Amino acid sequence: MEAWECLEDFSAVRNLLEQSSNSTSWFWRFLWGSSQAKLVCRIKEDYKWEFEELLKSCGELFDSLNLGHQALFQEKVIKTLDFSTPGRAAAAVAFLSFIKDKWSEETHLSGGYLLDFLAMHLWRAVVRHKNRLLLLSSVRPAIIPTEEQQQEEARRRRRQEQSPWNPRAGLDPRE
C-alpha cells in the first residue's frame, strides 16, 4: 500500500476525494490533479455500473444519511471496504467518490459537509486497517517444531559436541 500512503493523512484523503469527484472539472483535474485522483476517476468511470448495483443493494442509504443516521452507512459501506492491496484501496476510494457524486444530487446538505463526512470515514477506515495490520504483525504465533525438526536439532547438537573445535568435545557429559 506504499502508493496509497497518502490515505493516512486526513487532508490528503479530503483532497483526493475532492479532486476525484464530479464537482471538479476534468480540465482542472487534467492540469493540476494528482495522478491518484486521475486513477480514481478512471476506476469510477470504468466500474460505474457495478457501483450502481452496490448502491441499490444498500437500500435507503441516502435517506438515512440525509436524516443524519450513520449506522447503515457504517454497516453496509465502511465495514466492507478493503485496503489489502493498492488496487482495492483505489477501488474503495473510487466507490466513496461515486457515493459523494450520487449523494450530492439527492441532498440538501452542503458539498463541504459531504466531503468532510466521507473523507473522515475513509480516513478512519484506513487508520483502523493499518492498526489491525500492526497488531497482527506484532503477535507471533507459537511455533511447535515437527518431529523432523527436533531430530535435526538433536543431530546438529551431537555434531557440535563432537566437533574438534568444541572445547568440551570428548568430555564425560555427566560432569
Curated annotation (Swiss-Prot):
One Pfam family per UniProt: Adeno_E1B_19K
Entry's localization field: Host cell membrane; Host nucleus envelope; Host nucleus lamina
Region (Disordered): 147-175
GO biological process, one term: symbiont-mediated suppression of host apoptosis
Gene Ontology CC terms: host cell endoplasmic reticulum; host cell nuclear envelope; host cell nuclear lamina; host cell plasma membrane; membrane
Keyword terms, alphabetized: Apoptosis, Early protein, Host cell membrane, Host membrane, Host nucleus, Host-virus interaction, Inhibition of host apoptosis by viral BCL2-like protein, Membrane, Modulation of host cell apoptosis by virus
Protein's UniProt keywords contain Membrane: yes
Superkingdom field: Viruses
Main localization, broad class: host cell
Signal sequence bounds: none
Annotated family: Belongs to the adenoviridae E1B 19 kDa protein family.
Stated role: Putative adenovirus Bcl-2 homolog that inhibits apoptosis induced by TNF or FAS pathways, as well as p53-mediated apoptosis. Without E1B 19K function, virus production is compromised because of premature death of host cell. Interacts with Bax protein in cell lysates.
Protein name: E1B protein, small T-antigen
Organism: Human adenovirus C serotype 2 (HAdV-2)
